[in-house]
């Protein structure tokens, strides 16, 4: 029996709606504004309009409750917007 994505997650995710700023320096500097979708103890998912994030890429992030560095884990385009999963470092 195959488990759903929700069943395979190691941590509980909580819906969270807040403004978010992501800063990437490589390959080209960019500041990306978006919104949090959900958070967990080790990461978060964000919706934004920047399609160039690549898995493994490191970014700086800032939202009202936290700031720090994170690694891009996945990136997908859905209905004209981009969603990215991040692991907090």
Give the residues covered by each predicted segment.
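Structured alpha-helical
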Residues: 1-89
């Amino acid at each position: 029996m195959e488990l759903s994505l929700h069943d395979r997650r190691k941590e509980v995710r909580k819906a969270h709606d807040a403004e978010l700023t992501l800063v990437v320096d490589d390959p080209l500097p960019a500041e990306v504004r978006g919104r949090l979708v959900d958070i967990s103890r080790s990461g978060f998912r964000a919706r934004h309009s920047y399609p160039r994030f690549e898995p493994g890429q490191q970014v700086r992030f800032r939202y009202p409750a936290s700031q720090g560095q994170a690694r891009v884990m996945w990136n997908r385009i859905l209905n004209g917007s981009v969603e990215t999963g991040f692991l907090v470092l």
